[in-house]
From Swiss-Prot:
Amino acids binding Zn(2+): H652, C654, E676, C737
Enzyme Commission number: 2.1.1.14
Co-factor note (free text): Binds 1 zinc ion per subunit.
HAMAP family assigned: Meth_synth
Organism name: Thiobacillus denitrificans (strain ATCC 25259 / T1)
Binding-site list for L-homocysteine: I442, G443, S444, E495, D610
Entry protein name: 5-methyltetrahydropteroyltriglutamate--homocysteine methyltransferase
Keywords: Amino-acid biosynthesis, Metal-binding, Methionine biosynthesis, Methyltransferase, Repeat, Transferase, Zinc
GO-annotated biological processes: methionine biosynthetic process; methylation
Length: 772
């Protein structure tokens, strides 16, 4: 009899209950006890949602991030928070955000600002989830504190849950971190493993039979040293009284199959969506006692599983494995929304093609029933699934011959600017007349309660189009006045009218659909609601021109047009799986190209095309990067390069460790790139030690994800560090990212200090010819 289990459940709640509880606590509006109560209620409800499973994950819930929780479980706390005597949860928030609440801290451990320096944040493998990077040094020590995990396990057991604790494995944990002193992370493995032994013993003592130990690092290309680390680690853990389910996901094992199959664990989970080709070889490699868990329901996308086709493949596997077969989603369901049944306004036909987290668990129920008791026992469910899958395949809404013809007509010239960068730069300098070290922002300003209320009322039909436009124009005017008062050089209209940098565009493109409650966690309390790219994409009308033109009418300074690039639109959407992603990306590129042309016709001479998610789409295996970067860069160039030399094209990339893709970024040929660098203390600019980047660059000078306010001198120091690698005449000064999640009382002083820093740098340049 096959068993079912889950690797993890979305923690934010069907109505984003965790988000609102966190933000209330951070603002000082509610107590820690109230926050803990919300967490307990969410865990209880989520365990109920998974009640039909044979094993339910415990420990997948985190108030901020599961990697951060693992750091605290292992006693790996940054020194800068060790002096705080507060609750561990507050210390976790200090590491993640720079402070535990949005009030002044009584301690200051950073020269840059009040509070402490926030931990570095980066993408979780190739997803849109972000984790707080563990910090290591040669002197790092570990000490177990499993109190939170053990409390959740006891909570689940008391609720009658068949609990399977979930932890991040030791090798992946080390790989996820960064050695701040340049020491060898793997040198810490021998210190770390005894803490894992102690943790597993504590879980066994608390009644756990199985522990899921996540090692997604196994789907990446590992050198011999890291492969050996897996053998060392799991031979050290093999005496544990609990049974270990080693979980891999997000890709194929390939050359790591033998390693994964022969590690001394009781079971192995593989992603049978992206790594199906691993399964047949593993069947021959696995010892006869070992469980094989197959992730047969896609945990990263929202399309219904074709249950009939899955059973056709799975039934012979079940015959060979018998009771050693477990089935599950491919990965944690953290990456999909909670419940499709909440969607009361989604197009009915499109809704019938989808499955969110709860529906994916129901798909597991149908699959295991068919495997264990025959397809006849779930014939009605299988028939309904088959009808939905057939309808999607055959729907005329999915295919647009005109769009396919436009993509077929793309030529190499479609992605070429009229002149090389040096020629363009001279024309742009003469036209824009910007000072040295020009200042700008990345696009968005705070989305206030008034803005959100106006948008809600407009969508609910409580105010008409004229009233909504007037409200948005008032907000745009406020943003423009604030920027002029601060002395910024290139302004933005503030994006008051935009709910999300992807959803806003998707709502105006044919081929997209939208949920009301399809939220997924990006980091901490930050949630995104990815659009659903279900068919060929067409732009019926201009999307941003009216708002940008209005913003420009209020100022004599340059106003940036703000667009989301095709690669980011793709990577931050739930993308159709019936054609190559490259094809969908080119369709999106043509829609953005048309919008760029319309902005230019409206007199906009600075246009930013955000590609925040360019790196996110990189395959986990470096050997596959060239293909992805080829079509991604081509798509950006198609979108950006239909303009005159005088029009300055910007692009923005956040959280992008881009040292290893700098040549591809240069090939995009944007006139200006702005990037996230402040959390990494300009380490991201190391790429320029060995690569002469030809165009202009704005290294982010303060971390917008933290409420801390940088000092002018801190910003000056960062830009001086940047000027060691980038010629000062090609440097811009800007925040790391958009400001929509911040408050005006944070934004104004931070930008004021940024402008003050620019003036200091200009004065120094005039006196010495050097920055500052």
């Amino acid at each position: 009899m096959a068993l079912t289990h889950n690797l993890g459940f979305p923690r934010i709640g069907a109505r984003r209950e965790l988000k609102f509880a966190l933000e209330s606590y951070w603002k000082g509006e509610s107590s820690r006890d109230a926050l803990e109560a919300v967490g307990a209620d969410l865990r209880r409800r989520h365990w109920q949602d998974q009640a039909a499973l044979d094993l339910v994950p415990v420990g997948d819930f985190a108030f901020y991030d599961q990697v951060l929780d693992m750091s605290f479980t292992l006693g790996n706390l940054p020194e800068r928070v060790q002096g705080f005597d507060g609750h561990p949860l507050d210390n976790a928030f200090r590491v993640a955000r720079g402070r535990s609440a949005d009030i002044a801290e009584t301690h200051c451990c950073s020269a840059a600002c009040s509070g402490v320096a926030a931990g570095e944040m980066t993408k979780w493998f190739d997803t849109n989830y972000h984790y707080i990077v563990p910090e290591f040094a040669a002197s790092t020590s570990f000490k177990l504190d499993a109190s939170r995990l053990l409390a959740q396990l006891a909570e689940a057991q008391a609720a009658g849950v068949r609990a399977k604790p979930v932890i991040i494995g030791p090798v992946t944990y080390l790989a996820l971190g960064k050695a701040k002193d340049g020491s060898d992370k793997l040198g810490l493995l021998d210190r770390l493993l005894p803490v894992y032994v102690e943790l597993l013993e504590a879980l066994a003592g608390a009644g756990a039979e199985w522990v899921q130990i996540d090692e997604p690092l196994l789907v990446t290309e590992l050198n011999a040293e890291w492969q050996h680390a897996f053998n060392r680690a799991y031979h050290a853990l093999k005496a544990s009284r609990v049974k270990l389910l080693l979980a891999t996901y997000f890709g194929q094992l390939l050359e790591n199959r033998y390693l994964a199959a022969t590690l001394p664990v009781a079971g192995l989970h593989v992603d049978a969506i992206s790594g199906r080709d691993d399964v047949e070889p593993l069947l021959g490699l696995l010892p006869a006692h070992k469980v094989l868990s197959l992730g047969v329901v896609n945990g990263r996308n929202i399309w219904k599983t074709d249950l009939g086709a899955t059973l056709d493949w799975l039934e012979p596997v079940a015959e060979r494995l018998g009771e050693r077969l477990w089935i599950a989603p491919s990965c944690s369901l953290l990456h999909v929304p909670v419940d499709l049944d909440s969607e009361d306004a989604l197009d009915g036909e499109i809704k019938s093609w989808l499955a969110f987290a709860k529906q994916k668990l129901d798909e597991l129920r149908v699959l295991v029933a068919a495997l264990n008791h025959g397809r006849d026992t779930v014939s009605a469910e299988l028939a309904a699934n088959r009808a939905a899958c057939d309808a999607r395949r055959n729907s005329p809404r999915v295919n647009d011959p005109a769009v396919k013809a436009a993509v077929a007509a793309i030529t190499p010239q479609s992605g070429a600017r009229q002149s090389p960068y040096a020629v363009r730069a001279a024309k742009q300098a003469a036209h824009l007349r910007l000072p040295r070290f020009p200042t700008t922002t990345i696009g968005s300003f705070p989305q206030t309660a008034e803005i959100r209320q106006a948008r809600r009322r407009f969508k609910a039909g409580e105010i008409d189009d004229a009233a909504y436009r007037a409200a948005m124009q008032d907000e745009i005017a406020h943003s423009v006045r604030a920027q002029e008062a601060l002395g910024l050089d290139v302004l933005v209209h503030g994006e008051a009218e935009r709910n999300d940098m992807v959803e806003y565009f998707g709502e105006q493109l044919d081929g997209y659909a939208f949920s009301r409650f399809g939220w997924v966690q990006s980091y901490g309390s930050r949630c995104v609601k990815p659009p659903i790219l279900f068919g060929d994409v067409r732009r019926p009308r201009p999307m941003t021109v009216e708002w940008t033109r209005y913003g420009q009418s209020l100022t004599e300074k340059p106003m940036k047009g703000m667009l989301t690039g095709p690669v980011t639109l793709l990577n931050w959407s739930f993308v159709r799986d019936d054609q190559p992603r490259a094809e969908s990306c080119k369709q999106l590129a043509l829609t953005i190209r048309d919008e760029v042309a319309d902005l230019e016709k409206a007199g906009v001479r600075v246009i930013q095309i955000d590609e925040a998610a360019l790196r996110e789409g990189l395959p986990l295996r470096r050997s596959q990067w060239k293909t992805y970067l080829g079509w991604a860069v081509e798509s950006f160039r198609i979108a950006a390069n239909g303009v005159a030399d005088e029009t300055q094209i910007h692009t923005h990339m956040c959280y992008s460790e881009f040292n290893d893709i700098i040549e591809a970024i240069a090939a995009m040929d944007a006139d200006v790139i702005t990037i996230e660098t402040s959390r990494s203390d300009m380490e991201l600019l190391d790429a320029f030690d060995h690569f002469s980047y030809p165009n202009e660059i704005g290294p982010g000078v303060y971390d917008i994800h933290s409420p801390n306010i940088p000092t002018p001198q801190h910003i000056v120091n960062l830009i001086k560090k940047a000027a060691e690698r980038i010629p000062a005449e090609r440097l811009w000064i800007n925040p790391d990212c958009g400001l929509k999640t911040r408050q005006w009382n944070e934004v104004i002083p931070a930008l004021g200090n940024m402008v003050a820093a620019a003036r200091t740098l200009r004065a120094g340049w005039q006196e010495t010819g050097r920055a500052g």
